[in-house]
Amino acid sequence: MKRVRCNKVRTVTEVKPNNAKIRKTYDLNEFDLKNLSSLESFENTKVKLALSKYMAMINTLEMTQPLLEVFRNRADTRQIVAVVQATMGFVHNRFNPLVTHFTNKMEFVTTETAETIIPGEPILFTENDGALLCAIDRPSIVKMLSREFDLSVAAEPQTSNREVLVAKTLVSNKRKRRSSNDEGYEFIKRPRTFSEYNQCMDALSDFNVTEIETTQYLLLLLIVEHAYLHYYIFKNYGALEYSKSLMDHSLFVNKLRSSTNAKMHNLLLSKFRFTVEESDKTSSGTTSKFTVYNFNK
């Protein structure tokens, strides 16, 4: 077959000025939706990343039971305290990113009776002979993690009675104390080197965690974040302001927002905002609101 040889062809594009314009119409709503979707996706990714880091940290404690079973076993105070203390340290690090260690001068006690608890506050702080005491309301945490409806708790709306309840509870929690430094009181072994930590992480790479288990970790993290913010008030403003914050969360929010608003963005509590409204049918169309305050404003 005979080949035909062609001469090389060179094309040239010339751009000439012209008054004609190419018009295209854009829908701004579409851009807004894409931007909102991107922001929501980014926030969801940050929430999932924070929760994944927390679950990986708890995995390094080498617990012998699942998270819910640990809190159901009232006799296993060692693991309960280890989980709460490790979670407090995790939240402390997210609240103060440049701080790597949490206080080791805290004593812990688990409470079981109604006289030593405050509804809605499963973790309380008080002072006992100059030492900081953390009281863990184990039954309430179990109900929250298992998502049970608590029909037996007595919530008193009157302010005067609530002040008495808070005072009695904080005093009752001082009667029993257990230190993390007591003789024979050993926390669960944690990794000390990168190789030990990597071994713990490798154990997470070949299985899936159910949504129910993940929700339990998320609930516990939110519980401890809420308690940590009260702890911040206790350490910086004293026991009196701390007790007031237990009764009135508007004071609780205002004190924190005044000086630590930037740090709140690292906590998962800053990702939620909603208001629960209840209509009062006895009065003429009035509505009482129970507001869950948001720090991300």
Curated annotation (Swiss-Prot):
GO terms for biological process: symbiont-mediated perturbation of host cell cycle progression. One of its GO terms (cellular component) is membrane. It comes from the Viruses. It is found in: Virion membrane. Its main location: virion. Keywords: Host-virus interaction, Membrane, Modulation of host cell cycle by viral cyclin-like protein, Modulation of host cell cycle by virus, Viral envelope protein, Virion. Interacts with host mus209/PCNA, cdc2 and cdk6. Acts as a cyclin-like protein and plays a role in the modulation of host cell cycle. May promote G2/S arrest by interacting with host mus209/PCNA, cdc2 and cdk6. The cell cycle arrest is characterized by an intact nuclear envelope, concomitant with sustained activity of host cdc2. However, viral DNA replication still occurs in the arrested cells. Belongs to the baculoviridae E27 family. This is Occlusion-derived virus envelope protein E27. It comes from Orgyia pseudotsugata multicapsid polyhedrosis virus.
